[in-house]
Design a protein with these regions (language model features):
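N-terminal signal peptide c-region/cleavage motif recognized by signal peptidases
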Residues: 13-15
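Mature N-terminal segment immediately following signal peptide/propeptide cleavage
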Residues: 23-43
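Active-site substrate-binding loop specific to GH73 endo-beta-N-acetylglucosaminidase modules
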Residues: 91, 103-110, 142-235
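Sec-dependent signal peptide recognition
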Residues: 1-7
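Short alpha-helix boundary/capping elements
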Residues: 35, 63, 133, 137, ...
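Boundary of Sec targeting at the N-terminus
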Residues: 19-20
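N-terminal accessory alpha/beta regions
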Residues: 40-156
């Protein structure tokens, strides 16, 4: 993926010829496309660089882990839906309010990482994969799996797509969001298999219904430990 990204970044920096200094305009364009909103200091640092030097600097500092400390509740035990229904009304309402608060805190945690990171490219690519392998709080319910998915996307943000794909189909947040955790032998759920082919890899019209059914069969057993929220494989 890094070779492909290098080529893309060189195109993004094409406002200047290959051996000339980028200049402020091309540097700002490159940093905007590979990050969020570059500061004047960042633009000034890239302005005297050639295209190749700029790309090499961008790729040299990439990260695979977040620098912002995790939210304090990240290892709290999750309450399963069946257990939640057994709670008194006031406790159930309080727990749901807690989940909403934690989800907002999780968004704030990631926004802080985006703002403070010394490597905006890492967060830009993490955001790209977050939009590609979509999961959302209303269905996932718990913020802990979404936090761990964010870590996973960052770890592989600039690595092998094949490695990321193998990891993401075992990701608890995605398994919940696309019903992979309820895909059972004899009672297949094809949602994850269909999205895997149509949205994540091949594209519409490049697979058959038989492909979907066989992929769903191959993904049976991918499940979640109800006590920890971690991925488990059930035979």
């Amino acid at each position: 993926m890094l070779r492909l990204l290098s080529a893309v970044l060189l195109l993004a920096a094409s406002g200047a010829s290959a051996e000339q200094a980028l200049g402020d305009a091309a540097a700002r364009q490159l940093l905007t496309r590979t990050g969020f909103a570059p500061t004047a200091g960042e633009v000034a640092a890239f302005s005297p660089l050639t295209q190749r030097q700029a790309v090499e600097r961008l790729l040299a500092g990439t990260l695979t882990v977040a620098r912002t400390p995790a939210p304090a509740w990240i290892d709290d035990k999750i309450v399963l839906p069946r257990d939640l229904q057994r709670l008194p009304d006031d406790e159930r309402r309080t727990y749901r309010q807690t989940l909403v608060r934690q989800s907002l805190e999780l968004r704030g945690w990631w926004l802080r990482e985006m703002v403070d990171t010394p490597v905006p490219l890492t967060e830009r690519m993490t955001l790209f994969w977050h939009n590609h392998f979509v999961s959302a709080q209303p269905k996932v319910l718990w913020p802990q799996p979404l936090y761990r998915q964010n870590l996973l996307l960052r770890e592989h943000a600039l690595g092998s797509f094949a490695t990321l794909l193998h990891a993401i189909v075992r990701d608890p947040a995605l398994l919940i969001y696309l019903d992979g955790a309820t895909n059972r032998r004899g009672q297949p759920n094809e949602n994850l298999a269909r999205e895997l082919m149509e949205l994540f890899t091949l594209g519409q019209g490049r697979y058959t219904e038989t492909d979907v059914k066989e992929a769903a069969r191959a993904l049976t057993g991918h499940s979640i430990d109800p006590t920890t929220g971690a991925f488990v494989y059930r035979r």
